[in-house]
A protein has these predicted regions:
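Exposed, low-structure sequence patches enriched in small/polar residues
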Residues: 1, 5-356
């Protein structure tokens, strides 16, 4: 493999994009029932990477694309938005991005039920640094295929009960990702040798199912905010996700006098154990673990914080003790393998708004 002889890694990047658009606004006349836009864009991306002789390799990528948008945002019952853009010349020739969403608001049992459908189809060029990277520790030049990402998502939202249910299905073909492997000594999990990071592309499609429930409850001064997420990946060695992720925030919110309000509460974050993405200090990027049976699982450990907020007009004082349950259970307080979270930390501060 090629090696960089510089004493440090560096890269430069700048981008210039120009877009010319013509649009008719929704409602500007009695015939304009929706907004309509057509546009053409020119994109110039410049990159610099070190070469093997101490010099610099320069890359320029040009791209021309055309697209259009149809949208309706006025009114109470029905709204929609659709955007399409296709690459017609340059590095992104043959790319396609189609995004759309539609929502219907229906009166339901004294509440308003919002039914929202959204989705997209993206055929995109992998990022430059997945295709080209030169450094002292890692070096690659890849010829990667276009990434094809499809998503279909549906959302149900109740305004009064503050309930929202969201379900999404993703399929990603030719998914590009970073993979990290190293040698681990049996007596020291933190000692790594032979570290290798590679940019890879999945040969088969990856399917991802996501279901989320958002529920806020308020009863007098008692408030309870919850987010529960379920996910399933068809290829956990490419896109690892926890099966269950929970966030819950329980607090009391009450006034003391007219201009003084106090919040007292605690929140908790929890996710089931899984082979979480590793971290590469040499790249400052997260990577998929690729160490076989020596992959490390994290999770199955709650993180609990307690806090108090004092609001006086436009000023807020707060105190917080994070990770108050440090040392409990199996002490597996990691979000990333080999990088433990902080123990209990006391924080305090003040913030204010500069408006009347």
């Amino acid at each position: 493999r090629q090696m960089c002889i510089r004493d440090s890694d560096n890269t430069k990047h700048w981008e210039m994009k120009n877009t010319l658009a013509l649009a008719t606004l929704e409602g500007f006349s009695k015939w304009a029932k929706a907004g309509l836009k057509a546009f053409v864009s020119y994109d110039l991306r410049h990159f610099e990477l070190p070469d093997t002789e101490g010099g610099v390799m320069k890359y320029n990528e040009h791209s021309v694309s055309v697209g259009g948008q149809l949208s309706k945002r006025q009114g109470k019952l029905l709204h929609y938005n659709a955007v399409a853009e296709i690459g017609v010349a340059g590095e992104d020739a043959g790319t396609l991005a189609v995004d759309g969403d539609v929502d219907v608001n229906i009166p339901f049992l004294g509440d308003t039920l919002s039914v929202i459908g959204s989705g997209f189809f993206h055929r995109i060029t992998p990022s430059f640094y997945f295709r080209n990277y030169h450094g002292r520790h890692f070096w690659w030049e890849n010829d990667l295929d276009k990434i094809i990402h499809t998503r279909i998502m549906g959302t149900l939202k109740f305004a009064k009960t503050k309930t929202m249910l969201r379900v999404a299905v993703d399929e990603i073909k030719n998914y590009a990702y970073l993979s990290q492997s190293y040698n681990v000594t049996d007596n020291n999990q933190a000692a790594h040798t032979g570290v290798t990071v590679q940019a890879k592309q999945s040969g088969s499609p990856v399917n991802l199912l996501t279901a989320q429930l958002f529920q806020d409850v308020r009863w007098g001064i008692l408030n309870w905010e919850n987010v529960i997420t379920y996910q399933h990946s068809s290829k956990t060695d490419v896109i690892p996700v926890p099966a269950l992720n929970v966030y819950s925030n329980l607090y009391l919110k009450f006034p003391v006098v007219k201009v003084l309000n106090i919040d007292l509460g605690a929140d908790v974050r929890y996710f089931t154990s899984y082979e979480a993405p590793d971290y590469s200090p040499a790249l400052s990027q997260y990577t998929v673990q690729d160490n076989g049976d020596k992959n490390v699982k994290v999770g199955n450990y709650p993180i609990v914080n307690v806090y108090a907020n004092v609001h006086i007009k436009h000023t807020r004082f707060f105190v917080m003790m994070t990770h108050v349950n440090k040392g409990s259970g199996d002490k597996n307080y990691f979000f990333v393998p080999h990088y433990p979270l902080n123990g209990s930390v006391f924080r305090f501060g003040v913030s204010w708004n500069f408006f009347n």
